[in-house]
From Swiss-Prot:
Alphabetized Gene3D superfamilies for the sequence: MetI-like (1.10.3720.10)
Function field: Participates in a thiamine pyrimidine salvage pathway as part of the ABC transporter complex ThiXYZ involved in the import of thiamine degradation products such as the formylaminopyrimidine N-formyl-4-amino-5-aminomethyl-2-methylpyrimidine (FAMP). Is probably responsible for the translocation of the substrate across the membrane.
Protein family (similarity comment): Belongs to the binding-protein-dependent transport system permease family.
Database matches in PANTHER family: ABC TRANSPORTER PERMEASE PROTEIN HI_0355-RELATED, ALKANE SULFONATE ABC TRANSPORTER-RELATED, MEMBRANE SUBUNIT
Name this protein carries in UniProt: Formylaminopyrimidine transport permease protein ThiX
Organism lineage string: Bacteria, Bacillati, Bacillota, Bacilli, Bacillales
Alphabetical UniProt keywords: Cell membrane, Membrane, Transmembrane, Transmembrane helix, Transport
Keyword presence, Membrane: yes
Matches recorded under CDD domains: TM_PBP2
GO terms classed as biological process: thiamine diphosphate biosynthetic process; transmembrane transport
Organism, as annotated: Halalkalibacterium halodurans (strain ATCC BAA-125 / DSM 18197 / FERM 7344 / JCM 9153 / C-125)
Domain ABC transmembrane type-1: 56-237
GO terms under cellular component: plasma membrane
């Protein structure tokens, strides 16, 4: 009974927020400033063909390519830093420095370099997502129990066996944690990139609706972007429960 109530708590809190939002929007009475949730849903339905068949696929492509590149870059960088201390001393500060630069300032530069092609938006997405993947994977490699490593060597394991039988399983929880953080950031990166320079995508569509003072139209793609982030986060969490069942029990 207690678990059922705990599972219900987030839903009740969300519904309470929606009721407060609906009442506040009706009291203000200016949809172009603060549309109500019902108005946003109705506008999403009205614009569904354009949103779901033109702009959503464009945004999903940016998110998918950006995440894939971030995973590859993150794993390669974390392995290089783990295997070579000089690389770690040289690269790690640059990783941290890359996160101190506002993405909103770099996005126009990417548009200047890559134009309105998909790659300017992918660059923004990679900039936001590769850091948590790299750092978490590297920390996972560093936290591998050295006693287990010595035990593997004592039992005659090769370096290849050591990597796949020890380092990969011990690093997987940290990698998945980084990926879980990166997925919502990928949605943000795609939206920011589209907002600043694109001719299609949910971020672009939201900006276009803003120029028309269409409040519900501005929020409609934001609503879809939020759902994408939540679904992506939940999918990685589900993958964690499948690959790491002991963590779910804990």
């Amino acid at each position: 009974m207690k678990r059922s109530y705990q599972a219900l708590e987030p839903t009740l809190f969300f519904l309470m927020l929606m009721v407060i939002w609906e009442i506040s929007a009706r009291m203000i009475g200016q949809p172009y400033l603060l549309p109500s949730p019902i108005q946003i849903v109705m506008r999403t339905i009205d614009l569904s063909e354009s949103l779901f068949f033109t702009h959503l696929p464009a945004t999903l492509a940016i998110i998918s390519i950006g995440l894939a590149l971030s995973i590859v870059l993150g794993i390669l960088l974390s392995l290089l830093m783990f295997w070579n201390e000089r690389v770690e001393r040289a690269v790690y500060p640059l990783l941290v420095a890359s996160q101190t630069i506002p993405v909103i300032a770099l996005a126009p530069i990417f548009v200047l370099w890559f134009g309105y092609s998909i790659w300017s938006k992918v660059a923004v997405t990679v900039l936001l997502t590769f850091f948590p993947i790299t750092v978490n994977t590297y920390d996972g490699l560093k936290s591998t129990n050295r006693q287990y490593e010595e035990l593997f060597y004592t039992m005659g394991a090769t370096k290849r066996q050591l990597f796949y039988r020890l380092f990969v399983p011990s690093t997987l929880p940290s990698f998945l944690t980084g990926l879980r953080i990166a997925v919502p950031l990928a949605v943000i990166g795609a939206a920011v990139g589209e907002w600043l320079g694109a001719n299609e995508g949910l971020g672009y569509f939201s900006r276009r609706m803003m120029t028309q003072f269409d409040g519900p139209g501005v929020f409609a793609p934001i609503f879809i972007l939020s759902l994408l982030g939540i679904l992506g986060f939940a999918a990685i969490k589900k993958l964690e429960n499948i690959l790491l069942p002991w963590r779910k029990k804990q």
